[in-house]
């Protein structure tokens, strides 16, 4: 019997010998720096995977796909309680999939952005417009009725190096999204940010999202962190350092992506990922500060992180790494009691600007054209292929049509720092100095001409 057949035979033994997901979902609420089940009052730990077949820039909405129920059965085998979805079509019907997930005890953390709707790293002020906010608000409307929506991400890795300029507008988006939920949803749905693990500004960025007025602060914060590789340890991986750094952080923290793949390679050319960090993540050392995490990623893509192979006939085949992760989840219980969470804490102090961190404490006001959506609702959802907010030198994204090009999808890197995003703009955030000067000059010239034209 081949290795693949042995793996599949073990898989078919079913969840009876492994940890089962609870077969119901109640809204998740936040108390102090932790998540709790609103009905049972038990602490909730995220045990999940990142779920976007085709990659994070795929046009396929997995929550509207006919294949969702197949995947839910596999999630149940894996023993998870949460999936993260990077992109959805807000005009599609998600009832069947969301209900199937709920019946399996599985929650969804949803990124509100798409490859056509996000804050541009290069032109954040221009991409923050009515087209963009209408899309985000319409996505909230499409999902606010599902009790198993754990939360929304207002951004993913918009900052992935030392240039943090765009983060001011992401925090403004966080404020706007929270305000929209408060006005138009029957329940509070938490809103947070998923950060790249950039050592130079890791702390400043986290504190920035947790400082200022409550209406502007994130409800939770997450890292895409790949520091633990293979058979590592709390010390070698830096996990102990992260615990110390965030010991006084007052909102829930979790790993929105984890699972290094720079490890020993199997004979089938796939990485041998032992997932030994699972025991650490759900240990008494971690749970006073962190509330679990999501393994990157469900489906096999060219980047070699996938747990499940989806063939051309849409059939699923689990990998050795899937079986390994399933066993690690099964043998690692959550800590008893409340896991040492902090019942009350103080918001962070807004970090000072420096050569490695630059953001405004005073946030920009919501665009005038978007205020009608805040007041009266987003209106008709326009879907992934609807108008884009992306800006080019001849289009500011604030009209009903866009000339913006689709950015090329990015795969996960093979190093320990994640850089997944929807490119967040038409130009790279790592432009050369001369390129930045040229862009700045063109912007200034364009705005001058625009103002002159409007004045005329």
From Swiss-Prot:
Pfam families: Glyco_hydro_72
BP GO terms, sorted: ascospore wall beta-glucan biosynthetic process; ascospore-type prospore assembly; cell wall organization; fungal-type cell wall (1->3)-beta-D-glucan biosynthetic process
Start and end residues of each stretch annotated as Disordered: 334-353, 384-434
Record localization: Cell membrane
Biased composition (Low complexity): 417-434
Lipid anchor positions (GPI-anchor amidated serine): 432
Transcription among keywords: no
Top-level taxon of origin: Eukaryota
InterPro entries linked: Glucanosyltransferase, Glycoside_hydrolase_SF
Propeptide segment residues: 433-456
GO cellular component, one term: prospore membrane
Class of enzymatic activity (EC top level): transferase
Residue ranges the record marks as coiled coil: none
Catalytic activity, EC: 2.4.1.-
Residues bound to (1,3-beta-D-glucosyl)n 1: 86, 156, 296
GO MF annotation, one: 1,3-beta-glucanosyltransferase activity
Residues bearing glycans: 248, 353, 415
List of residues binding (1,3-beta-D-glucosyl)n 2: 157, 197, 202
S-S bonds: 68-97, 211-350, 229-260
Swiss-Prot/TrEMBL keywords: Cell membrane, Cell wall biogenesis/degradation, Disulfide bond, Glycoprotein, GPI-anchor, Lipoprotein, Membrane, Signal, Transferase
Signal peptide (residue range): 1-25
Keyword set includes Isomerase: no
Topological type in the membrane: Lipid-anchor; GPI-anchor
Role according to the record: Splits internally a 1,3-beta-glucan molecule and transfers the newly generated reducing end (the donor) to the non-reducing end of another 1,3-beta-glucan molecule (the acceptor) forming a 1,3-beta linkage, resulting in the elongation of 1,3-beta-glucan chains in the cell wall. Involved in spore wall assembly.
Family membership: Belongs to the glycosyl hydrolase 72 family.
Full protein name: 1,3-beta-glucanosyltransferase gas4
Annotated organism of origin: Schizosaccharomyces pombe (strain 972 / ATCC 24843)
């Amino acid at each position: 019997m081949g290795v693949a057949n042995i793996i599949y035979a073990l898989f078919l033994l079913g969840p009876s010998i492994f940890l089962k997901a609870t077969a119901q979902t109640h809204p998740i609420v936040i108390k102090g720096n932790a998540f709790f089940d609103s009905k049972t009052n038990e602490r909730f730990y995220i045990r999940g995977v990142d779920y976007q077949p085709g990659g994070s820039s795929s046009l396929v909405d997995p929550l509207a796909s006919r294949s969702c129920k197949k995947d839910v059965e596999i999630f149940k085998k894996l023993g998870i309680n949460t999936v993260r979805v990077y992109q959805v079509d807000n005009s599609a019907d998600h009832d069947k999939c969301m209900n199937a997930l709920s019946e399996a005890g599985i929650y969804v953390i949803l990124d509100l952005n798409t490859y056509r709707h996000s804050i541009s790293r290069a032109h954040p002020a221009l991409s923050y417009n009515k087209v963009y906010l209408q899309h985000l608000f319409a996505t909230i409307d499409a999902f606010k009725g599902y009790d198993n929506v754990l939360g929304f991400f207002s951004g993913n890795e918009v900052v992935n190096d030392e240039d943090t300029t765009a983060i001011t507008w992401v925090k403004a988006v966080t404020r706007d999204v929270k305000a929209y939920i408060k006005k138009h949803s029957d329940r509070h749905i938490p809103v947070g940010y998923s950060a790249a693990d950039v050592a130079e500004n890791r702390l400043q960025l986290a504190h920035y999202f947790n400082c200022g007025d409550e209406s502007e602060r994130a409800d939770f914060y997450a890292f895409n962190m790949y520091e633990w590789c293979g058979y590592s340890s709390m010390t070698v991986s830096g996990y102990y350092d992260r615990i110390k750094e965030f010991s006084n952080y007052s909102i829930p923290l979790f790993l929105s992506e984890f699972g290094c793949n720079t490890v020993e390679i199997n004979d089938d050319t796939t990485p041998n990922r032992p997932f030994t960090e699972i025991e650490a993540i759900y240990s008494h050392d971690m749970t006073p500060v962190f509330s679990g995490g999501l393994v990157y990623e469900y489906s096999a893509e060219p980047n070699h992180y996938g747990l499940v192979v989806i063939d051309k006939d849409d059939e699923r085949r689990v990998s050795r790494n899937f079986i390994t992760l399933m066993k690690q989840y099964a043998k690692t219980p959550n800590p008893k009691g409340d896991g040492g969470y902090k019942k009350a804490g103080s918001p962070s102090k807004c970090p000072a600007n420096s050569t490695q961190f630059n953001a405004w404490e005073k946030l920009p006001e919501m665009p005038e054209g978007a205020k009608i959506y805040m007041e009266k609702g987003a209106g008709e959802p326009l879907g992934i292929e609807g108008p884009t907010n992306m800006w080019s030198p001849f289009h500011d994204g604030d009209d009903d049509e866009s000339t913006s090009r689709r950015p090329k999808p990015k795969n996960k890197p093979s190093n320990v720092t994640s850089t997944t995003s929807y490119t967040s703009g038409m130009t790279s955030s790592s432009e050369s100095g001369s390129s930045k000067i040229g862009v700045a000059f063109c912007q200034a010239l364009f705005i001058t001409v625009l103002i002159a034209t409007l004045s005329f």
